[in-house]
Every structure is written in structure tokens, then in C-alpha cells.
């Protein structure tokens, strides 16, 4: 099939809409269930590229959770700790497959943003992963294949209308890509940059030591940024993105936004949060919302009289600013990638507050010396890649 008619484009008034192959060849995808829309396909094709590259770079199954053409999370399939399984709401599922662990991590990093996501999987979707997907609010999934049991499970979602796309992994797009804006066609070579160890070899700080685990995390960060709307910054720890700042005009606002998300991810692991006693009737999304408010500055919105009773069996104690800072100080060895250079050392100062120890960025600012000096002050190791990773 050379083309697929869609209900509408980005918005309901944008008709007609379709996806098609300009060269007349068949589309490299097959819709197994549902009727994906314009934005669904944008998320699916960007997400597929991301997980395909993560798998190639790490040798591990990979997953990403996309919203509005940027990843909310991305991860590889490392086993979950007991704490992570609990904060990702999968502690009742027993031991998960590596692919399911990858999606639990990708979805769990920023659960508020991942609500209603589009999922991309690097490997054939198995039953464990399908069970996890089934219980979450999601728009669809793309993968190179699905086991029979996985399809049976996904068919139970949205009364059989959940969007399930199979992509042919052998498909290789043309070297030149095009897009139109205001009737004008833009053409460029595809971004085929290989994110590898050599790209991270130019370490410009006094600290030259980047351990293997951090190198993997830096590659995850840069590959994630390659498919994130610019400007973008990505914090990674333990094989998963823990905070992604996307689409900001200011670099430091990217760093702050992603840093706050990384902080929230770590705060969810604090005893004060793990000990929250939710009402049995409260669903996962409502619990996520309650936690987000509880660990933020507006905590009274869920702790006020008449409000806490709607969410908790027992009124929680206030998680004070001092307690949160003390807990966050335990988050160490975080990696950070940036899709363009840091123009000022304020980015490094903010990154330090979220436990960053290893950094990868292109370099090339007139103030590189000040940025390096700030890294040296904190004993950070920073690599200059020499390559910008803008994505629009």
C-alpha cells in the first residue's frame, strides 16, 4: 500500500490528510489495530528511530514514550529495583522481560507527561510489555512485531481500537528528506550521525574519567536529544532518561525544566512518598497527580482539610523544603546531554543541583572556558562532541 488516508492533520479542520511514499513504493508499516492519526504517526516514526538507535548503541531492548513529537522518556531494558518497580506502579507484575522493563522506565520517568503517550519499542512486543501497556492511558504503539499473546492482550484495550502499528525493520529511508512550510519545500540530508564512544572521547575537563555506565548513559542522552524538539537537554541515570527539557528557546530554561523533572523522579523514591497511603479507589493517574502536587511547592492543595481525604487514608506529613533538599543531595553520578553548547556556566550550576557528574555537549561557545572552569570546580567530567543535535 502506497498511501494511507487519515481522518485529519494536526487539527480537525486540517483536511484532507494522508501519509504516502513519494517514490511510489509501499509504506513500511502495517496497521494491525485502530486508526492512527497524523500526530500518532509523527510520534511513531520519530520514536521508532530513537529506539532503533538505542538498541544499536547499547545492544539492549529499548522503549520510548512520546508526546507531541518529543520523548517524555526513553530507556533500555535493565532490570528494575524494588523501589523503581514501586514508583512505576509495576511492583504487582512480578519479574518483567527486558523490553517491559525498558517501557516501565520510559513511562515512569515523567508519568505526568507520558499520560496519553505513543509508545515505540525496539523489539517484538511480548506479553509482559503488552500487559504493562494495557493498563496505562496511551494512544498507541509501534514495534517491529508482536507475539500472538501480546496482540490478544492489546486487542482488549479500547474495545479493540487501540492503535497498533507494525514497522518493517529492514526499511531504510532515502538519504535526502523533505518537508513543506507555507508551500515552500525544505530539503536536507538525513541526520545519520552515529552516537558512539569516539564522539565522547574529547574530554575537556580536569576530570578525564567517564566510567562505562556513564558512557552508556551519555549515549542514551544524546540519542534521545537527536529526536527531541530543540532546544533540548536530557538528564540520564541507570539506563534511562530521568528528565527531558524540550522545545525551549533558552538553554538554561531547558536545563532547569529537565532538572526539575529529574528531581521529581528522584523525590518519588523518598520514604515520604513511598509511604503515602492512597485510597484503594484512587487510580494510577490520580496518584501520579497527587504525588506531583505533594512534592511541589503547592502541596497544601492536596494536604488541606477536605482535600487530603479525597486521596489518602491518612493525612501525610508535609515534605519540607529542607527534607527534599537533603534527599536530592543523595542523587549522584547523573549524566547530562545538551543538543547545543552551553553559553553560560549557569547551566552547570543548575545541573549540579540535580546530581550531574558527567556531561556531553558540542562546545563552541565563546565562554567555553568559563563553562569548563565551572565543571572543574565540581569535579565533573565533560566531553565536547563538536556536533550539534538540533531537531525540528
Identify what each model region corresponds to.
Residues 57-65, 164-167, 230-237, 267-278, ...:
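Flexible, glycine/charged-enriched surface loops at secondary-structure junctions
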Residues 53, 227, 264-268, 353, ...:
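Conserved helix-loop functional segments at active or binding sites
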Residues 61-62, 67-72, 76-78, 232, ...:
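Glycine-rich phosphate/pyrophosphate-binding loops
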Residues 175-210, 268-293:
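Substrate-contacting helices/loops that form the catalytic groove of nucleic-acid
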Residues 70, 125, 237-240, 248, ...:
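Active-site-proximal loop/turn and secondary-structure-junction residues that shape catalytic pockets
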Residues 1-199, 214-232:
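Active-site loops and adjacent core secondary-structure elements that bind or stabilize anionic groups
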Residues 72-112, 242-341:
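Glycine- and Gly-Pro-enriched alpha-helical subdomains that act as flexible
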Residues 117, 121-122, 135-165, 170-172, ...:
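C-terminal binding/interaction regions
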